[in-house]
Amino acid sequence: MTFILRVRQICTKIHKLLNYSAIILLGLPQNFFMLDLIEFLEPVPLHELNDDKGYTDGQLAKHIKIYEEELPDLENIDIVLLGITETRGNGYFEAENNAANIIRKHLYQLHYWHNDIQIADFGNVKKGATIKDSYAGIKTVLAELIRHKKTVILFGGSHDITLAQYEAYIELNQQIEATGIDAMIDLRGDSPIRSHNFLMDMLTNEPSMVKHYNHIAFQSYFVHPRMLETMDKLRFDCYRVGTVTENIEEMEPVLRNSHLLSFDISAIKYSDAPANKNCPNGLTGVEACILTRYAGLSNLLSSFGIYGYRPQDDVEELTAKQISQMIWYFIDGKNRCKKETDLKESHNFNEYHTAFTEVDTVFLQSKKTNRWWMQMPDKSFIACSHGDYIKASNNEIPERWLRVQERN
């Protein structure tokens, strides 16, 4: 593993000397610097997923470039699937974990509706000798894929894998807005379980690449009030599950602004995700799919992880089916996102001028997707909702506007 990481460091230095545009001009394949990644990956056992029964032409498996013997070429690929097998961070020792392949089995059976979206499956990231080795492997693979402008969906593994997901952006020296969807806020410093406290490192360690953090669907009885006070002092935004379910469309701008999304299945109630034994309440399966579709609509989001699935706790693999459908809806959102145009193309937007408390501002509404943007005092535009426009029209300060101003 150390040798491979050294090779990776050398490739990174080459990247700085020979940028991506130069690679294209020289006619090199997009995965020219990705030859070492195969050392971190396990191929997809396709014959095991379908019992050698094959797939019909309409199913996803027929339209995905799958790593069976050779890594797929990244040319024209929009989304890369990446299975995670590392689960030691959840406090359980599991010699083998097949969560990713069970999710993959059900995903492959779904029907393909999105001809404009090209997908590759890079298999599973190998588990390292230690949990830190696993983090390093995930970080390395993810950083390389993001560097090549790919959107990566990670699935399987414990929720602390979010930290490795985040470390990919540190390697890329990219500041991000991160969003977590979880019934709990994993800042429990008194817990020895990594998946309970990883946010502490992510939000406080240096160098920090998190310019803002959102937490969606927390359940109040799982969160100490002082923890919320701390999050608020840091100007991070936290949304109770009740707030989310009452007005779920308000979460779309939150996810549209995000670069990293981490979804713990503990946010979904037990009846819709029976592998989540600790939460009788929470999001419904439909609401989870709506949120992941919103995430797919973001043209900023480059990594999306779904964590916390333990097959041994599942019933009839219903949770795996739920996760596979959440991934399907993310792809659906990405397909819709491709139809959005740049804000500079003013003819594709309705423009509304308004003022609140003596502040003049502009709202833009997309003619293609009906999404909204709001102009800030520095003339930049941020994602917002129709509700923000209604408040501004009534001479009220939209809370989203105020929170962004506080952070600037």
Across the structure, where does each feature detected by a protein language model lie?
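Conserved alpha-helical scaffold segments that buttress catalytic/binding sites
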Residues: 35-81, 88-408
